């Protein structure tokens, strides 16, 4: 699976063929050995050199990956409610593009630091967002993660942001 002269399909087939059922499951969900089934890390596959990695990264206002070095941190963007209020499709796509570029950069750097500045693990290329639930009740505790209460606005916002993330 590390042979770059093979096609992606061949490499994926080779990799999957080397994994046990337990290892396959461990790569698509949280690692319960970390003390909780509600975490954002895989177990990794040490015998194949596949490290534990952070599979969901907060992307509401930026790549929540702390800093990988002094003064080298992810960009911060306006939150979804502010972005939705702008009604500016190109800014939504640019936010997605920035997030996608930074996720790729953090992934390529090969590590992630926790809030204490210690190297924690690899950062993945998947994110918590965009959240497109409809903000209908101001008491909903996660309304700030939503672009607004209009279903069309939410759908267009999500489409532009995801397409921006995938362009990189």
Feature map (PLM): residue ranges:
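N-terminal beta-rich core of secreted/periplasmic extracellular enzymes
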Residues: 1-168
